[in-house]
A protein has these predicted regions:
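Vicinal oxygen chelate
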Residues: 1-3, 86, 90-122
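N-terminal beta-strand motif that seeds the catalytic metal site of vicinal oxygen chelate
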Residues: 1-21, 71
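Short aromatic/hydrophobic contact patches that present stacked aromatics
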Residues: 7-9, 46, 70-72, 106-108
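Short loop or secondary-structure boundary microenvironments that flank
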Residues: 14, 61, 75-77, 99
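Conserved active-site alpha-helix within GNAT-family acetyltransferase domains
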Residues: 15-27, 32, 116
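Short, conserved charged micro-motifs
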Residues: 16-19, 79-84
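Short amphipathic alpha-helices in soluble, non-transmembrane regions
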Residues: 22-26, 84-89
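Conserved short beta-strand elements that form part of the metal-binding/catalytic scaffold
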Residues: 31-66, 116-121
C-alpha cells in the first residue's frame, strides 16, 4: 500500500528554470537537488522539502497555471508561518490568509507563473 508522498510536481513555462530557482530557493528557502542525468535534459528543477519529500518543477510547452490543484506546504508553527508570509510580501508576492480550516492557520500565494500555493501550520 501507499507509505507516503515522494514528490509533487508543479508546471512552469519553457525557459523559466532560473526564475524557478530564484523563487523556490531564494524566496522560499528550498534546496535544489540534482536531477538524474536521463531527466536533466527535460529542463525544470527538483527541490528538497522537509520530511524527505520533493517539489519538482516540470516544464510544460502548453503551460496553463493551476488554481484549484495546488501543493500545501507544511510550516512548523504560526510564528514561522507569519514570518514566511512577511517574506513573500517583501518579495512583492500577494498573500491571502484563509481561516476556513479549523485548528490550522494558512495562507495562499502564487508562484511567478500563477500556480496556486498553500502554506499551512503543521
Amino acid at each position: 500500500m501507499i507509505d507516503g508522498l515522494h514528490h509533487v510536481q508543479v508546471a512552469a513555462p519553457p525557459g523559466s528554470e532560473e526564475e524557478a530557482r530564484r523563487f523556490f530557493t531564494g524566496v522560499l528557502g528550498l534546496v535544489e537537488v540534482p536531477k538524474p542525468e536521463p531527466l536533466a535534459a527535460r529542463g525544470g528543477a527538483w527541490l528538497e522539502l522537509g520530511g524527505g519529500g520533493e517539489l519538482h518543477i516540470g516544464i510544460d510547452p502548453e503551460f496553463v497555471p493551476a488554481f484549484r490543484a495546488h501543493p500545501a506546504f507544511a510550516v512548523d508553527g504560526a510564528e514561522r508561518l507569519t514570518a514566511l508570509a512577511a517574506r513573500l510580501g517583501g518579495a512583492g508576492i500577494e498573500v491571502t490568509w484563509d481561516q476556513a480550516q479549523p485548528g490550522a492557520s494558512r495562507f495562499y500565494a502564487t508562484d511567478p507563473w500563477g500556480n496556486r500555493l498553500e502554506f499551512i501550520t503543521a
